[in-house]
A protein has these predicted regions:
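Bacterial N-terminal signal peptides
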Residues: 17-29
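Predominantly extracellular/luminal regions of secreted and cell-surface proteins
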Residues: 115-142, 298-334
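Hydrophobic or amphipathic alpha-helical targeting/insertion segments
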Residues: 100-104, 112-117
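N-terminal secretory signal peptides that target proteins for export/translocation
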Residues: 1-14
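Extreme N-terminus of proteins, especially the signal/transit-peptide cleavage junction
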Residues: 12, 30-33
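Acidic, Ser/Thr/Pro-rich low-complexity intrinsically disordered segments
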Residues: 33-85, 94, 98, 108, ...
Length: 413
């Protein structure tokens, strides 16, 4: 939870400017629609490889270049197939950061909207239809990343051989590819058709799924991917990562100062927590979050875990703090690190700041992979403890409020 001062009123543009801009805009002719990317196939590639990628969309004629915002991915060839299709050969360095990399296509008419290209650490396998049931399942060798498509009522089935006690991890990227409203369902079944593990939604991956399981006996196991409501179409593209990689979804501490070295404990893997020394990036991304790849026993996770970057002074929750009289004292501005360790847990903080100043109080939980849905309430720091304001969800399950410090020079959160 981070407390940040609100900009001075002198730095805010008057609201009347907004009305003026809107009024002028109504009299201007509509600009022509720019280029748009609707599908990227494949939507990702492995480190250290060259990948031919097809971009399909609208008004992509006279394409000049594929522009990556930050990734060190080189475009070695560009081919205009037709006004709606562009092919590019991408060279991905062996040390390219894992995860999503934002790109646009620049044409003679301008830039497309942002899309994402995913970089994985495994070799890539293309789906081979038909693979709709266990009898026709496509055999794959782990570790690998499968590129597939779920069409209407389609179920894609992949077969792996596991020894007794062998571990398998699977993670699917679908909704996060931002190509289609594709809500995938992921499950692992044994050779008799019994479900060993399943995941529909995940606290770190939103509507995408991730799971890990240990084989109770030697045999063939099947990973199935489908649309959660058995829908699908040609745009429901996915990346399925298969291997024995770790699957944590939360870091502790979940935040740190840019450029500092921290000992991170990764949480959420069924095999238990594990530790890893991490040096946080010195440069803070626009979103204020660094994507860090957990590594256990030399094996990297397929999915990075976000860690909040902030220059604010760190303040650790001091339990017990489940009532106002025991509230943790915080001198604003600060970044508060806290945990909900039990059901019905309530944490109280006494925030001290000059009276009359205005502060943002923002919770970071689900954005960092935590499964909790935070509720934030702000109260006066007096005997009555009158509620000043509060929030449950703000642009997602995490909470955010703005509060002006009362005369007491403090308030309770």
């Amino acid at each position: 939870m981070f407390h940040e001062p609100v900009a001075s009123p002198r730095n805010r543009r008057p609201s009347s400017w907004v009305g003026l801009i809107v009024g002028l805009g109504c009299g201007l002719p509509m600009a022509a629609a720019g280029p748009a990317i609707e599908r990227i196939m494949p939507p990702g590639g492995p480190r250290g490889a060259e990948v031919e990628v097809e971009f399909r969309g609208r008004d992509l004629d006279e394409a000049r270049e594929v522009v990556f915002e930050e990734a060190p991915i080189a475009v070695t060839a560009l081919q205009q197939v037709d006004p709606r299709t562009v092919k590019a050969t991408l060279r991905i360095p062996a040390d390219c950061p894992l995860g999503g990399h934002r790109l646009r296509i620049r044409t003679a008419d301008g830039l497309s909207e942002l899309r994402t290209f995913r970089v994985a650490g495994f070799t890539q396998t293309r789906e081979a239809e038909p693979n709709n049931d266990r009898a026709a399942a496509q055999a794959v060798t782990m570790p690998t990343t499968v590129v597939g498509v779920v069409t209407g009522e389609d179920v894609d089935c992949y077969k792996v051989r596991l020894p007794a006690g062998g571990r398998i991890a699977a993670a699917v990227e679908a909704i996060r590819l931002d190509q289609e409203m594709f809500d995938p369902h992921l499950e692992l079944v044994d050779d008799k058709g019994f479900v060993v593990a399943a995941c529909d939604d995940h606290p770190l991956l939103a509507q995408d799924g991730m799971l890990a399981a240990v084989a109770p006996a030697e045999g063939d196991y099947f990973v199935r991917v489908r649309e959660s409501a058995f829908g699908g179409n040609d745009g429901c593209v996915y990346l399925l990562h298969l291997g024995d990689f770790p699957v944590p979804h939360l870091a502790w501490p979940p935040a740190g100062r840019p450029g500092t070295a921290v000992e991170v404990t990764w949480l959420g893997d069924p095999a238990g927590p594990f530790r890893q020394p991490v040096t946080l990036p010195a440069t803070v991304p626009l979103a204020g979050v660094a994507e860090i790849v957990p590594v256990r026993d030399g094996v990297a996770a397929a999915v990075p875990v976000p860690i909040r970057l902030s220059p604010l002074q760190r303040c650790d929750e001091a339990e017990p703090d489940d009532e106002p009289a025991k509230a943790t004292r915080v001198a604003a501005p600060a970044g508060i690190l806290a945990r909900m360790d039990a059901a019905e847990d309530v944490d109280w903080f006494r925030v001290e700041a000059p009276k009359g100043t205005t502060w943002n109080v923002r919770a970071w939980a689900r954005q960092l992979g935590s499964p909790i849905d935070v509720v934030v309430n702000v109260h006066r720091d007096d005997d009555k403890r009158e509620r000043i304001t509060g929030n449950d969800d703000s642009d997602g399950p995490d909470s955010a409020v703005r509060v002006t410090v009362p005369d007491q020079g403090s308030f309770l959160v």
